[in-house]
Amino acid sequence: MMSDEQHQGGDGQTTTNTNTVAYRAQPVVPMDIFTFQNLRMQPGYAPNSTKQINLYYWWGDHETTCPDYTQVTTAWVVGWVKSSKIRAMKMPEGSTDEPTYSLDLDIRDGTGQLKIIQLKTTLGANGRQSNYDENGGVLQRNSPFKENQYYSFVLKPALQRQAPQQQEQLTTIQGYLVSYHEIVNHNEITTHLSDFVKAYHRMQSNFRYFIHKVIRAYSVNDIAVSLDVIQSHLKDIMSEEQNTSQQLVDYLQYLVSEKQILTQTDSGYMFIKEQQ
């Protein structure tokens, strides 16, 4: 769908992945601005740590037996630029350090308006024109983004807060810029929309509903269904994170031992007669 060669990083240059160290790829979920702004946030814990972090989900279920969610770490959003500005961060009086800059970018796509930010950005460092702010004497940078032009963005979701002293009062979801490129072929907008519709349909599908539906179809014919068969039915409609052996086993055991609506045999799982 996208590669490192297709997007520009924070310095505005095309980036190529030259890292030879093995790492786990993070999925980039296509979505429109309305969906991005309505992501659900749920607290969780960092891997192998007791430190609590914020996790962002597109579709979430709070049950711990078999969570029904897709975690969104990065998203693919397409939109046109409404306004953009690179501003110098306020420096302490008398400081001789080089100023740092941040990007403020507002984009739209017809479903909503999204604020994109990038702290300590290097964008605009080699801009078309520079001048000094008459008030503070700070070098100003021009944004490389063109207004009313379509761009493709890879973003990380983040909750925008009203003020540091009011951290419990969350406002809207905003995006941290990971990479971008200017869209010159509008077929890319159509591709993004198509991928988003397919992803949205898959993510809205209820994990438990499909498991129940598959097992019940076999149970009414007095056939126990194995784990492999259940997975084969789910593979085309569930995300990779949802269609895993461990998640299925956890939930099936929950239905057997806690809910007591399934029976388990050497051949697989069946609904008990009263539940068929």
Curated annotation (Swiss-Prot):
The record lists the organism as Dictyostelium discoideum
Matching InterPro entries, A to Z? NA-bd_OB-fold
Taxonomic superkingdom: Eukaryota
What is the protein name given in its UniProt record?
Putative uncharacterized protein DDB_G0287991
Residue ranges for the region (Disordered) are 1-20
